[in-house]
Swiss-Prot record:
Family: Belongs to the TrpB family.
Protein name: Tryptophan synthase beta chain
Assigned keywords, A-Z: Amino-acid biosynthesis, Aromatic amino acid biosynthesis, Lyase, Pyridoxal phosphate, Tryptophan biosynthesis
InterPro entries, A to Z: Trp_synth_b_CS (IPR006653), Trp_synth_beta (IPR006654), Trp_synth_beta/beta-like (IPR023026), TrpB-like_PALP (IPR001926), TrpB-like_PALP_sf (IPR036052)
Reactions catalysed, as given in the entry: (1S,2R)-1-C-(indol-3-yl)glycerol 3-phosphate + L-serine = D-glyceraldehyde 3-phosphate + L-tryptophan + H2O
Organism in which the protein naturally occurs: Brucella abortus (strain 2308)
Gene that specifies this protein: trpB
């Protein structure tokens, strides 16, 4: 197959219909279309309003703790014996992950639109916590849909949401994971369109969500680009991030897309291997289809039914991916690779012991790719890994898998 011709810029999408090439769009129930268009209009107005930008910037700085640091992971780099590895420390944000970046932007949008009720979906629980956090900060009721499987996997985060005043609704349909939680949230939205704002946590869903989530998360890459120029005097050779729905990854990637010298790698959940169905590598092993309002790469069976998938990481077990990632895969700009559960677990422990940093299992997938790549690169090469969240939420899962009683 011929490699596609590179566009003049990889940063111009989506078009006005929300398409990134053949991906994206607005495949929603008729009742939702007016709301989607209202949201798009509100976002267009807000993004061009200096007051909105100033308020978001102030909250990001004084509430969330931005900018997050770009940290030279010296212990890990020396252990691997190749490229210098830097961590973009999104784990240091308020609430412990990158999710707060998007939630602050969207809660300000909800306020502008006069919405009085917030709903959200969550897998790893980090988006649920961040949504409950911003709802508490602005005095709005918040309902968080969580797959029943994930309620069990993420007990500390479920308790945090409740502490913050959110109502947590377990979803037992399907496998009781992120896809099912998103289905329930969409059902809620359809029946409560007047007063409800759906605060989507990932760069998927109907347009304008993939675009606005990307824009709110792009602060990650914008900062990282500036920080690496200050610390190394040049751009990195490689940037790496884990991809579930893909918001932390697109946030890091987007500001680097037109830097041709920078190799970009997205890391999918390879689960127990791509041979069967126990993985969530939709771009490595899926094909295009429509889910949750957009056309993108999905895990499907021969009849087009969406597969449940599996990952040790609750935040990566989504059977699809944001449409911009699908386009970046097909355009050849970004390489997407799978990492197995056991590789992520090994990286989780290695990072903890060489750096004194406990990463989220999602981030551990990206670190596992760094473990593979860094030793093949020269010591003069530079890599940035997005440390998308901290791993406190995962210690019970990891303990169980390692046979330790916590």
């Amino acid at each position: 197959m011929n490699k596609p011709v590179a566009p003049n810029s990889y940063k111009t999408g989506p078009d006005e219909e929300g398409m990134f090439g053949i991906f994206g769009g607005r495949f929603v129930a008729e009742t939702l279309m007016p709301l989607i268009l209202e949201l798009q209009q509100a976002y267009e107005t807000a993004r061009n309003d200096p007051e909105f930008k100033a308020e978001l910037n102030a909250l990001s700085t004084f509430y969330a703790g931005r900018p997050s640091k770009l940290y030279y992971a010296e212990g890990l780099s020396k252990h691997l014996g190749g490229a210098k590895i830097y961590f973009k420390r999104e784990d240091l944000n308020h609430t412990g992950s990158h999710k707060i970046n998007n939630c602050l932007g969207q809660i300000l949008l909800a306020k502008r639109m006069g919405k009085t009720r917030i709903i959200a979906e969550t897998g790893a629980g980090q988006h649920g916590v961040a949504s409950a956090t911003v709802a508490a900060r602005f005095g709005l009721p918040c309902i968080v849909y969580v797959g029943a499987t994930d309620v069990e996997r993420q007990k500390p985060n479920v308790f945090r949401m409740k502490l913050l005043g959110a109502e947590v609704k377990p979803v037992s349909a399907g496998n009781g994971t992120l896809k099912d939680a998103m289905n329930e949230a969409l059902r809620d939205w359809v029946t409560n369109v007047e007063d409800t704002y759906y605060l989507i946590g990932t760069a998927a869903g109907p347009h304008p969500y993939p675009e606005l989530v990307r824009d709110f998360q792009s602060v990650i890459g914008t900062e990282a680009r500036q920080q690496i120029l200050e610390q190394e005097g040049r751009l990195p050779d490689v940037i790496v991030a884990a991809v579930g729905g893909g918001s932390n990854a697109i946030g890091l990637f987007h500001p680097f897309l037109d830097d041709a010298s920078v190799k970009i790698v997205g890391v999918e959940a390879g689960g127990r291997g791509l041979e069967g169905e126990e993985h969530c590598a939709s771009m490595s092993a899926g094909r295009p289809g429509v889910l949750h309002g957009n056309r993108t790469y999905l895990l499907q069976n021969a009849d087009g039914q969406i597969l449940e998938g599996h990952s040790v990481s609750a935040g990566l077990d989504y059977p699809g991916v944001g449409p911009e990632h699908s386009w970046l895969k097909d355009s050849g700009r970004v390489d997407y690779v799978p990492i197995l559960d056991n590789e992520a677990l090994d990286a989780f422990q290695l990072c903890t012991r060489t750096e004194g940093i406990i990463p989220a299992l999602e981030s551990a997938h990206a670190i596992a790719q760094a473990v593979k790549m860094a030793p093949t690169m020269g010591k003069d090469k530079v890599m940035i890994v997005n440390l998308s969240g901290r791993g406190d939420k995962d210690v019970h899962t990891v303990g169980k898998l390692l046979g330790m009683d916590i």
